[in-house]
Amino acid sequence: MARKTPIARYRNIGICAHVDAGKTTTTERVLFYTGLSHKIGEVHDGAATMDWMEQEQERGITITSAATTCFWAGMEQQFDQHRINIIDTPGHVDFTIEVERSLRVLDGAVVVLCGSSGVQPQTETVWRQANKYEVPRMVFVNKMDRAGANFLRVVEQLKDRLGATAVPLQMTIGSEDEFKGIVDLIEMKAILWNEADQGMTFDRADIPADMLEECEELREQMVEAAAEANEELMEKYLEEGELTNDEIKKGIRLRTLANEIVPVLGGSAFKNKGVQAMLDAVIEYLPAPTEVKAIQGTLEDGETVAERHADDTEPFSALAFKIATDPFVGTLTFFRVYSGKLESGTALLNSVKGKKERIGRMVQMHANSREEIKEVLAGDIAAAIGLKDTTTGDTLCAENSFIVLERMEFPEPVISVAVEPKSKADQEKMGIALGKLAQEDPSFRVRTDEETGQTIISGMGELHLDILVDRMRREFKVEANIGKPQVAYRERITKTSEIEGKFVRQSGGRGQFGHVWIRFEPAEDGDAEGLEFVNEIVGGVVPKEYIPAVEKGISEQMQNGVVAGYPLLGLKATIYDGSYHDVDSNEMAFKIAASMATKKLAQHGGAVLLEPMMKVEVVTPEENMGDVVGDLNRRRGLIQGMDENPSGKVVNAEVPLAEMFGYATALRSATQGRATFTMEFERYAEAPSNIAEEIIAKNKTGE
């Protein structure tokens, strides 16, 4: 089958934003203008096409990133038809993992900001993640019709808070109720969209006289930014003081792709203004798959690094970036094709798991409807139905051309709760449901507590777990009770100690004998999970076949902790002496001896309890400021700064997670629902002694 759209006309983009910046509405409008969606879905009515899970529609926030394909040839049909694959990403901080996954497979991103609240804490998180994956991006300042909206203030925030070289390509005409349209600074014309046909048509007009001077100044800055793209443009600009419109576009494109500048556009998706021009900018300034760095991976030896280019003739390689369970077809595995092509019915290799997968049916998604396809080519994003062993982050490649593409890193969960099925019938269903949810979401973990036999689920925040329990009820019809949230405490030693571990058992016949001296010290990276183990034994005082057992004894004891039963972080252990018995020594005896030595860290290692500290940002009306700060102080919070934005005062604080349970409800009642907050994991810090004693005592009595 021949390629319908040349790869140079593909755009794989993500639309990222803070919770209320209006990202879903923006995506909806994109689908409307590109002709796929006939009635515009409003999030206010809970009917947006992209938000396809019931909870998303109720809560009005996007949880799963659905991938959608649409086509666009420009507001005035001035381009050849381009294929735009949009990955919708969630904006809530509990779902940062989804954003990270999406950014991994995108080539470019549109960051949507709210014209009045501007750069929010979640924006900073998304921005950092986009920097990590070097994703070229542009900004769409949405909600220009909102009270307090100010386009140029948001441009300043981009520079100050995110350190971005923001270059406006437009200026908004009016704001709040007076928002009329935008000025295109390249053409120096006003664009006014027609409200009667929901913005499908528009007029170009002269720039309002009172804005002319400001627009000329902004244009000058934009032309300067474009001229810095290369020497040729710079020379022309210095000689003539001007560039042609095509040269400006070329310069801005080059610098956007190089991640040197961030073009900024404005509009109001809700009022059908500006999204059409934003789509044009996606085509003009964001990269095709062939214009980003070729993806790298490792070959079968696990060391040699190879590249795969966006080319249909190269061997097939793809990355699975999302698993979703669909009530009608079962498991959908979303994947991005980096190189080569694939027909349905072909067998592939999952190189991470080392297992074969047969691709039966493939579909391409439009928000919540799907089209079955027979073939995918380089640059495509599609979903395969019924893969058995593939999970998020796995590589799929041609059987004869092994490669493992760069893996994704997933954060450790910070909050756990016990779940208990309400009836015997729910018990079995709950196991299946939790298994499926964990397969879809790598930041969600399920385990059974060995001592209590309870099922414990862990995730990135209260909202994250609420939604998963909610999905269990709706999608899998499992009724469950939720226990009190448990905090993921950790332990760490603070001083160096040399400890003897000796395990001797004589009981007639063959005995047991293991004897070690171990130096324990805090590792350089105090938050490192896992053990840094050094063997300094000389002269075989402990035979080398027992050394792995010593390491295992220490690391198993690390998992169970030494003070209160929580895993130890940042431990370095060096075995430097010991002794053995020709007959009685064995691996088990040395493992127990090492474990006994590790347990003694409670007395000798200055072991302390660590608690997760959260970075909390509260936006509150001024009159509630005192209550909010007082409440955070009561929760052992450390106020780190105060700021203000149009939506009110902003309080930044670091607060222990243990004190943040139920905070959403408390904040709502203290401020009549006018304040909002976001919270994300910051670091582990030593718990105050009174708190630590309480937790240790609780764990000893086994409450």
Curated annotation (Swiss-Prot):
To which protein family does this belong? Belongs to the TRAFAC class translation factor GTPase superfamily. Classic translation factor GTPase family. EF-G/EF-2 subfamily.
Q: Which PANTHER family does the record associate with it?
A: RIBOSOME-RELEASING FACTOR 2, MITOCHONDRIAL, TRANSLATION ELONGATION FACTOR G-RELATED
Identify the species of origin: Teredinibacter turnerae (strain ATCC 39867 / T7901)
Which residues are involved in binding GTP? 17-24, 88-92, 142-145
| Cellular component GO terms, alphabetical | cytoplasm
* Keywords associated with the record: Cytoplasm, Elongation factor, GTP-binding, Nucleotide-binding, Protein biosynthesis
Q: What is this protein called?
A: Elongation factor G
Report the PROSITE patterns cross-referenced here: G_TR_1 (PS00301), G_TR_2 (PS51722)
Q: Which SUPFAM superfamilies is this protein grouped with?
A: EF-G C-terminal domain-like, P-loop containing nucleoside triphosphate hydrolases, Ribosomal protein S5 domain 2-like, Translation proteins
Q: Which CDD domains match?
A: EF-G, EFG_III, EFG_mtEFG1_IV, EFG_mtEFG_C, EFG_mtEFG_II
Its BP terms in the Gene Ontology are: ribosome disassembly
Gene encoding this chain?
fusA
Q: Which residues form the tr-type G domain?
A: 8-290
In which compartments does the protein localize?
A: Cytoplasm
Q: What molecular functions are annotated in GO for this chain? A: GTP binding; GTPase activity; guanosine tetraphosphate binding; translation elongation factor activity
> What role does it play?
Catalyzes the GTP-dependent ribosomal translocation step during translation elongation. During this step, the ribosome changes from the pre-translocational (PRE) to the post-translocational (POST) state as the newly formed A-site-bound peptidyl-tRNA and P-site-bound deacylated tRNA move to the P and E sites, respectively. Catalyzes the coordinated movement of the two tRNA molecules, the mRNA and conformational changes in the ribosome.
